Amino acid sequence: MKFSNYPITEEVKKGVEGMGFSKPTDIQFKSIPAIIKGEDVLGIAQTGTGKTAAFAIPIVDKVFRSSIKGRKDGVRCLVMVPTRELAQQIQEVFKSVSKFTTVKSFAITGGVEQDPQIHKLNKGVDILITTPGRMYDLISQGHLSLNRVNTLILDEADRMLDLGFYKDIEGILGRLPKHRQTLFFSATINAKIKKLAYSLVNNAIRIQISPKDPVSKNVRHYVTNVEMDDKRYFLENLLEQNAERKILVLVRTQVRAERVVKAMERVGVDSLIIHGGKEQSERNSALKAFKAGDCMLLIATDISARGVDIPDVEIVVNYDLPDLVENYVHRIGRTGRGKQKGEAISFVAEGEAPLLFEIEKFLGKKIQEIEVSKKEYQTILDLSNEKSLGDLLSQIEFDLENESPKKKRKQKNKKK
């Protein structure tokens, strides 16, 4: 079935066509008819399945139809997401779908000035995409009312729970009309997610898209056994061998991300960085530069990269192995998209062996090891452009010993 055959307005069809869509993906094919009918939906699907368009297309159509009939002002659809980047990305999809309609969508997140957001809300917004923190700030200050919301969407719900937003989500229910449509999307499902989902949805249609292979066949997986303190040298070596390829390096924490950036700076390698501690404008600029190819190296934390569309990534480097197997799948899902080929390279320290075991168990196969001999290992360290403290002290001593007599005389005269 083609999008042109769906019972949606011509304006929305035109927007979808402009996005280059002709036929729906599995999640879109199964979700859109149910959402159009007003059903609650519980969707289990991973990133990269077309999930955002699965709810954006029917919701824009729904809001647009009500505007034609003469709706009252106010937010009609609330979309809650875990991260700023995901909010911005979803906003872009809504913007594209609604391009030829009068529907107004807007993303509100922390990390940016609040006044422009308030100004935008006052002008009128139909679809609001938001992270919990900034939303509650605006509600408590009286700038945001949700009493006209007729559709609630939770996207990346599993990640929201990981980040501790359970009480925030529960708290929002009391501020929403009881009679509403609820769409709940998650990449994974477990007891806690089920509990939350069924507290929100009513007689929901459950849609689960489970690929036979949890990871793309277009991705080749490799591991290299590396001492924790030597990972930066191996990354430098990898970058030198793949200077023209777009590389995404994933780490566990913000501190770790900053350390990797500093390590690359010391050897003259340009890099971009995104994590939760950065201002939103900085994160947006970094993503824009990386997508444009202005810089070929992006260092990110799991949280900041989750759900974000980063096209044309050729190599994903697991600088640290993720704590959860599911995060390995999300990480390497950044490469090998569509018909493109990709590589996932994991630097594994001795203490990370149990994590690697769990990942291989999940994949159902051993990951190919890039074996490095002791000689090759030492060569990688020796060829690094980073100088050790001992090297720097030796260089200073050498410079002092070879300092010109004329310069020494000047320094003596200054002391006098």
Task: Name these PLM-found stretches.
Residues M1, K69-G70, A292, I370, ...:
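Basic Arg/Gly/Lys-rich low-complexity intrinsically disordered segments
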